Amino acid sequence: MEEELICRGFDSVEVLFVDVFEKSRLSVGGDGERMLQTPQTGSLMLSSLLTTRRTISSMAALQQPSRHRFPPPNNIQRLPLRPDGQQEPIKLTEAIKQQFKQSIPLLAARVPSPSITKFKTNPEIRKALLNSKNLRSVEPDPDSTDNAFKLLLLNTPHKDQIPESTLKVFQEHDIQIKNTKLDLDWEYWMADEIIERLLPDQLTDIPASFTMIGHIAHFNLRDEYLPYKYLIGQVILEKNLAIKTVVNKIDNINSQFRFFEMELLAGEPDYTVTLWQSGCRYRFDFSKVYYNPRLSTEHDLLSSMIEKDEVVVDAFAGVGPFAMRAAANRKAWVLASDLNPASVEALETNVRLNKLQGRVAVSGGDGREKIREAVRTLWLDKPFKTPNSSPLLPDHFIINLPDSSIQFLDAFRDLYHPLSDSEGFLNAVKKKSRLPLLHCYCFTKQVDEPESDICQRVSEVMKVEISPSTVARFELKFVRAVAPHKDMYRITFELPLKLLFSSSSEESRA
């Protein structure tokens, strides 16, 4: 692991972790998002990173001196507390930036320039050096006109705070200790430090957490922070080189296509993003589709349940997080559809980007109709050129519209019956070792008894009892907490034969 990280330009694994945490902590979503997004490393699982860092930090050989952060000046004027809507939102100005200028008194060791590396790497001197991210511990000596001397900045303005062992080394080499100052300005401090120092004292939670989607930083600001939304956006934009656009989610949700309305806070009005996840490339207009990077782990988990050459029907495919993974990584055949024309356009684009034209068939339309059409399409239209060219039957149905997914499950009633007279269909169903798996994402407010609540609702719509004891391959998987007393789950089970032939006697014939 260390060789891989060092080759990216880091001196050691521990130095990398310091760099990652200091540069990326603002990219951790405030509602529990577990991904870190950094220019150096891409996406990292926060839990894995923390575990790895704890292990590595216990190794003495990799221990680094603790890094010091200078707080912003105490005399910065905080912004006034303004009820939303009473006055124009406050924006970042040059006058605000100027308040962050500060001169910090320090001591420095005046060292001959040819010996600077020798003294800087001396263990007794290193522990007394200034060690702060984005600050150099070596500066030119203003009193040395011929550059014969340089200054090693120490971490204190008081000589009695320098370790005796460090002073001894300086004395042995006749090194002068002199007063100097460290000039800091707006560029030194990180976004959360700036925002915390500027906001009114009454606002105690710092709204510096956001979701990264490509080059877009996506906020969900509470009402009390709206008067400062443009300032927050501008600070985030200036302090994160990878960010080109900062937006804030508006409460309004497009009722038909279920994507969030958003407003531009800072940067370019460019909402077309390109990103990589699990070896797949995605491009889409974030302002016109629904996409949640917090579900990346679940996308991977569900995809791992799909075997090579299985058939997947993704009726609410969005931009294709399930469809692309299933086809590219699992070598499955996928029918992907969505009601939103922008999602369909993104699906077609992503199929081309990942060179999956032969494995993913894209269409647009209502999810219920696409579920009902899927079996006929696979059996009669043969949309894929499979090795044995036989008609296909579905192995997986993915229903990912959590707010209303369960309402669509009536589409599975009698799903197979229309093809019962088609030549070879019943025999093919009989020969198949397993019936299709349904993967349905949904919300529940019964957080203490999710299984009872979800199974009851699913059973009522399907008019068949769905429970761990009545269906095969049952699983109820917690996905994430959405809000207090509201969780997201995935219910997975094998569709019962009596459901697929619910209005006929074909069940017994199959």
From Swiss-Prot:
GO terms for cellular component: cytoplasm; mitochondrial matrix; nucleus. Keywords: Cytoplasm, Methyltransferase, Mitochondrion, Nucleus, S-adenosyl-L-methionine, Transferase, tRNA processing. GO terms for biological process: mitochondrial tRNA methylation; tRNA N1-guanine methylation. It comes from the Eukaryota. Its EC number is 2.1.1.228. It is found in: Mitochondrion matrix; Nucleus; Cytoplasm. S-adenosyl-L-methionine binds at residues 299, 338-339, 366-367, 400. GO terms for molecular function: tRNA (guanine(37)-N1)-methyltransferase activity; tRNA methyltransferase activity. Pfam families: TRM5-TYW2_MTfase (PF02475), TYW2_N_2 (PF25133). It catalyses: guanosine(37) in tRNA + S-adenosyl-L-methionine = N(1)-methylguanosine(37) in tRNA + S-adenosyl-L-homocysteine + H(+). Specifically methylates the N1 position of guanosine-37 in various cytoplasmic and mitochondrial tRNAs. Methylation is not dependent on the nature of the nucleoside 5' of the target nucleoside. This is the first step in the biosynthesis of wybutosine (yW), a modified base adjacent to the anticodon of tRNAs and required for accurate decoding. Belongs to the class I-like SAM-binding methyltransferase superfamily. TRM5/TYW2 family. This is tRNA (guanine(37)-N(1))-methyltransferase. It comes from Puccinia graminis f. sp. tritici (strain CRL 75-36-700-3 / race SCCL) (Black stem rust fungus). The gene is TRM5.
